[in-house]
């Protein structure tokens, strides 16, 4: 086979959060009301001081005030809102201050445990502060002493929200307006990890003492059937086992069950906290060594090292009477126990590709 010269990858492109989109559009709409200026782009200042220019799809007056919209660009790590129209409708008010409202496609908080009170629009604290800072500065520039009513919406947001964890978190009717830095960093997965933390916090605030952190749908179904847990207690951790364990170290619960496919659990057992293939791989020689520690023959060890997949290695071990699923779960449990406080009861479950339990440890 001839060698090929690998192409040099282009730098990954950053994007902007829905919070940045909301800030840009609310500022543009308010500027139209106070200054009579309809811009096709607007500059905003991000929380860490960077200045960015965001293009607008429209900026126009309405019967109640003004509105502006922009297309959410998540850069080279597109999320569920990538390409969606985020818009702001702004009305002036005699009462000072900035009041936020959920427009079409933006959800409302209905459960305790989030950073916002029940009944509030799901516009997170940092985006609220970004909008308030920009609107206050605009008001001062124009000598305006009144306030602003700001309604944020996302076109199609109610349907998009069904692809997120919002329904499980108790955010109904649409998406959340998010962001802590204003920037979407490619493959940072910050939003996903934040949703894991929120899921744990919401469960705790609603009196749930036992959660199950699951790598996917099959493991979630297995935990739901095994324990009869409500959806609010089921945490979709994906590949981010470390996000669950480290959050529990900071904010413990009474009990956590972790469940995943055998291959994923074997990565955790080997000490990897990010189970994605970009960051960790299945170590067949290590599985063979663990089998050897349990009395596996030399022939079985060799067959396991030569296996094509972890599932094949598991099948070989079980056929020879070696409880590899339990062994892997026991090692994964030790990794977890090194992170979470002793007050947290931890247990591990491994499933096969049919969703059947093939190992456990507690």
UniProtKB/Swiss-Prot annotation:
One of its GO terms (molecular function) is cobalt-precorrin-5B C1-methyltransferase activity. The lineage of its organism: Bacteria, Pseudomonadati, Pseudomonadota, Betaproteobacteria, Burkholderiales. This is Cobalt-precorrin-5B C(1)-methyltransferase. The keyword Methyltransferase applies. It comes from Burkholderia vietnamiensis (strain G4 / LMG 22486) (Burkholderia cepacia (strain R1808)). InterPro entries: CbiD, CbiD_sf. The keyword S-adenosyl-L-methionine applies. It catalyses: Co-precorrin-5B + S-adenosyl-L-methionine = Co-precorrin-6A + S-adenosyl-L-homocysteine. Keywords: Cobalamin biosynthesis, Methyltransferase, S-adenosyl-L-methionine, Transferase. It holds the Pfam family CbiD. Its EC number is 2.1.1.195.
